[in-house]
Amino acid sequence: MLRLCLAFCVAFVGLHMPTALAQTTSLQGSPGPTVAGWIESATFPDYGITLNAKLDTGADSSSLGVTGLDRFKRDGKTWYRFTLTGMDGKTVTIEQQTNRTARIMRAEVEDTRRPIVQLKICLAGQVAVTDFTLTDRSDRRTALLVGRRFLSSRILVDSGRTHLFPQPCEDGK
């Protein structure tokens, strides 16, 4: 009797294991993180700018490629002015107050400090205000690198696919 019960339990678990695994790996439409490709379109809805983004699980923070980065003081506080250029060529100049910087350590060059700003981003249907370091990414494939701080608990990256979300957000917000 015990063997029969054990055999039934093993068979039952075996039949239902794929369902349980599918739920924990969170396929599109199920609760939990969204699956996205390693390159996706991302929108900054407050500015109407869309960029290609590299989703990089090896990077801790997110980095935004800008031009004309300028530090200045306004009312005794540190501000940054920078220009963001979308895939369609549209440009917008943004001014944001911040006192925060990130120390960037790379093996081939000396450590640098980059300003950190907070911007609202929409990526793979996920909208959030997140931190971005500002830098020149003109020598990179994408102007935007999205790191683990944004991806964690929101997006799982399929490293074999790209552009699973042609529209970053359904309603652009």
Where do the protein language model's features map onto the residues?
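Bacterial N-terminal signal peptides
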Residues: 5-16
